[in-house]
Amino acid sequence: MSRGTMPQPEAWPGASCAETPAREAAATARDGGKAAASGQPRPEMQCPAEHEEDMYRAADEIEKEKELLIHERGASEPRLSVAPEMDIMDYCKKEWRGNTQKATCMKMGYEEVSQKFTSIRRVRGDNYCALRATLFQAMSQAVGLPPWLQDPELMLLPEKLISKYNWIKQWKLGLKFDGKNEDLVDKIKESLTLLRKKWAGLAEMRTAEARQIACDELFTNEAEEYSLYEAVKFLMLNRAIELYNDKEKGKEVPFFSVLLFARDTSNDPGQLLRNHLNQVGHTGGLEQVEMFLLAYAVRHTIQVYRLSKYNTEEFITVYPTDPPKDWPVVTLIAEDDRHYNIPVRVCEETSL
C-alpha cells in the first residue's frame, strides 16, 4: 500500500466531541478518501497533520511491529499480540524523543493520559489492531457473560442471515483460516461459539489477575485469536443490517449509521461487507465511523484518547455518543486513529 498524507476531513460545525469522527469518515468517503485538511487551526498546540501517514500501515511497517512484539518476550516464546505493561511516561519517552511539534504534542497528550493511567500495553499494529485492542480490553475486564452472548438465537444467526442475504457468501475469511467459503456458515458458527466459550471462561474467574493471565494466553494463540475477530466482524455486519433495515423503514437510528450508509463505498450492508469489513485484517483496519459500529456490535462503550487531537474537543472521543448506561467501558489510546494501545493501572486518586 502506498503511503502518503493521511486524510484530514473537514470539521462539521456543531458536531459533538464523539460524533465528529463519524462525520469526518463520511466526509472523507464522499471526497474519495482524499479530502485535505481545511479546518482552521486552534491558537494553542495541535498535532500537525501535514506529515501524517495513510490510515493503514504498509506491510513492512506491520512486520516490523510484529518483530518488536516478539522481542518483548523473546523469539523462542509465543508471539505476543499485546505486550506486557510498562510505565506510560517511559513508553512516551522511548517513542517520542524529538522536539518536533508533533513529538511535543504527543508528549503533552501522554502526560494528560498519565493523570488517569500509570501504565500502557502496546498492541500489535496490524490491520486487526482496533478489534484486538477493544476485544482484549472487553474480555480481560469481563465480570459476567453479557446477555447478548447468552442469547440462544446467536448461534442461529449465520445460517439465518446467509440464507436471507445471499451476498454474504462473498465474505472473505480472515487470516489463519483453513477451508473455503462453502463452509462459511460452519466457520462463523464456530467463531461465535468460541467467543462465547472464552468470554464465559474469563468471566467465571474469581480475580482480575487470573482473568488477565488467561486473556494474555488467549491472545498468544493466533488460531483462536483470529477466529474471535471473525465473530466480531460478523456481529458488526449483523448490527449494520439491523440499522440499515430500520433506517429504510423510517425508524429512528443512531446518527452514525446514517453516515455509515452515506458513503459511496457502503450505501448498503452488501457494499459495507465487500468494501470495508472484508478488508479488515487484510488490507485495512476500521475507519472512524466503523468504531461506532464495533461499539454497537459488542455493546461496550469505547473511550479513546486520540493523542493527535490533543488540546481539541476530540482528545477524548466516546463511541457511541450517548451509550446505554449499562454498557461496560473500555479505554484505548490512539496516536494516529489507526493504531490503538491499551492504558492500564488506573491512578488511585482517579476514577472514570
UniProtKB/Swiss-Prot annotation:
The specificity for linear polyubiquitin is given by the 'Glu-16' residue in ubiquitin chain. This is Ubiquitin thioesterase otulin. Residues 1-48 are annotated as: Disordered. Pfam families: Peptidase_C101 (PF16218). Residues 18-37 have a biased composition (Low complexity). Keywords: Acetylation, Angiogenesis, Cytoplasm, Disease variant, Hydrolase, Immunity, Innate immunity, Phosphoprotein, Protease, Thiol protease, Ubl conjugation, Ubl conjugation pathway, Wnt signaling pathway. It comes from the Eukaryota. One of its GO terms (biological process) is Wnt signaling pathway. Changing Y56 to A/D: Abolished interaction with RNF31. Its EC number is 3.4.19.12. Changing Q115H: Does not affect down-regulation of NF-kappa-B signaling. It is found in: Cytoplasm. Changing N341D: Stabilizes H-339 in the active conformation, generating a more reactive enzyme. Severely decreased NF-kappa-B inhibition and increased NF-kappa-B signaling. The modification Phosphotyrosine is found at Y56.
